[in-house]
A protein has these predicted regions:
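Conserved nucleotide-binding/hydrolysis micro-motifs of P-loop NTPases
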Residues: 57, 70, 77-80, 116-118, ...
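Short, well-ordered secondary-structure micro-motifs
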Residues: 19, 62, 83-84, 120-124, ...
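Conserved nucleotide-sensing/catalytic segment adjacent to the nucleotide-binding pocket
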Residues: 67-106
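Canonical P-loop GTPase G-domain recognition
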Residues: 2-16, 145-190
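Structured catalytic cores of enzymes that bind and process phosphorylated ligands/cofactors
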Residues: 33-34, 41, 62-65, 69, ...
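Conserved G1/Walker A P-loop phosphate-binding module
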Residues: 1-82
Length: 190
């Protein structure tokens, strides 16, 4: 089992609130309402991350202390969140600061993308951040239970070609892909 203990650690609005690094971070990113908090709750095996149907609920960088050794980091959702341009700029700066300051601690960046959509510009920008900072990237396709197997095969190939990264199809509903995600996280944290 990957997560033996977990607790919410801090909701950081500024870099000064980032906790001292431990043995590594795994950060989770994606557009608003793509399912980051739901995936985290599945990995934690408890409802610790707040889930909302309202886009843009995560407005801070949320650090969860896992096994007293690592941080799983929930980045604010980007995209269509109904927030002001000023607040979006603040999020962007905070995320850029996170990458810049913790690039050596980030063991894996997990980008959740909606399997029913094509790659969005905001997803491409996140991938570029990862490439710029030399971070390992895992693409997790969410909501795959909405696709046929034939559609899913095409979508996996599309995102693999688009981002040149490992792609894992995942469904919160059926739990498809959870084992593979856990294995990939465990490998990154070795």
């Amino acid at each position: 089992m990957l997560v033996r203990s977990v607790r919410f650690f801090v909701a950081a609005r500024t870099v000064e609130q980032f906790p001292q690094p431990l043995e590594g971070d795994v950060c989770f990113a994606g557009r608003s309402n793509v399912g980051k908090s739901t995936l985290l709750n599945i990995l934690f095996n408890q409802k610790l991350a707040k889930v909302s149907k309202t886009p843009g609920k995560t407005r801070t960088i949320n650090f969860y202390l896992v096994n007293e050794r690592y941080y799983f980091v929930d980045l604010p959702g980007y995209g269509y969140a109904a927030v002001s341009k000023t607040e979006r700029r603040q999020w962007k700066k905070l995320i850029e600061d996170y990458f810049s300051l913790r690039k050596n601690e980030i063991k894996l960046s997990v980008l959740l993308v909606d399997s029913r959509l094509t790659a969005q510009e905001s997803d491409r920008i996140f991938v570029e951040y990862c490439e710029y900072y030399g971070l390992k990237l895992l693409i997790v396709l969410s909501k795959t239970d909405k696709l046929s197997e034939a559609q899913l095969k095409k979508v996996v190939q599309y995102f693999s070609d688009e981002f040149g990264s490992e792609v894992i199809p995942y469904s919160a509903l059926t739990r498809r892909g959870v084992r593979e995600i856990v294995e990939r996280l465990a490998k990154a944290l070795e």
